[in-house]
A protein has these predicted regions:
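Extended, charge-enriched "interface" segments that sit outside catalytic cores
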Residues: 2-120
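Conserved small/polar residues in nucleotide/adenosyl-binding loops
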Residues: 179-186
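Internal helix-loop-helix
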Residues: 77, 83-175
Length: 186
């Protein structure tokens, strides 16, 4: 009969060297105030009135806990559920809670609509800077935020559609539930 091989952890781990030239994890810093090019561009392009809010947002985005949300949202990929447990077609995509937290923050801070709801000089600059800071944490959620932002000018070309959809599009409350749009036949 074969006898299991007894091995100690050091038997399979190579003893090489102690690395000394590695950087530390970049966290717990202000993504806005530490970015000289961004802070200068915001002022140059007329968004200086938003610098304080950008600084607060940059500090929040740069915390270790918040940066971890970005890693989690990428580590745990969305999962497609094509059918429910009874076999009915659902075609629902399920996202990790970290993704929803990132989306919630983006919506609450108006990354999806602030220049449309609070227009003025530099409004697009401040919104772009907020978006730039937030997508450094995780870029994937930037797509639905940007598509939502881009939808409103097009909808406003048809006032009856804008009247129907604009309140929901510009709302500062994130709703992670899946909704289906009305059928064209209804």
């Amino acid at each position: 009969m074969n006898k299991p091989l007894a091995a100690a952890p050091n038997d399979w781990l190579a003893d090489t060297h102690q690395p000394e030239n590695l950087s530390h994890e970049l966290c717990d810093y202000n993504l806005y105030t530490e970015d000289a090019a961004l802070t200068a561009a915001v002022v140059r392009e007329g968004g200086q009135w938003g610098a304080e809010a950008l600084s607060v947002f940059g500090q929040a985005c740069g915390t270790a806990d918040y940066l971890a949300l970005g890693r989690q949202a990428n580590q745990y990929r969305p999962e497609l559920d094509t059918h429910d447990r009874f076999g009915r077609r659902t075609d629902q995509v399920n996202f990790h809670p970290a993704y929803h937290q990132l989306m919630d923050t983006a919506i609450r801070h108006g990354l999806h609509a602030s220049p449309w709801t609070e227009p003025g000089p530099g409004a697009h600059v401040v919104r772009a800077a907020h978006t730039y800071l937030h997508t450094q944490v995780e870029a994937g959620h930037g797509c639905p935020i940007t598509m939502t932002f881009a939808a409103l000018p097009t909808l406003r070309l048809q006032p009856e559609l804008a009247q129907l959809w604009e309140p929901g599009i510009t709302a500062r409350h994130y709703d992670c539930l899946l909704y289906t749009s009305p059928s064209p036949r209804d």
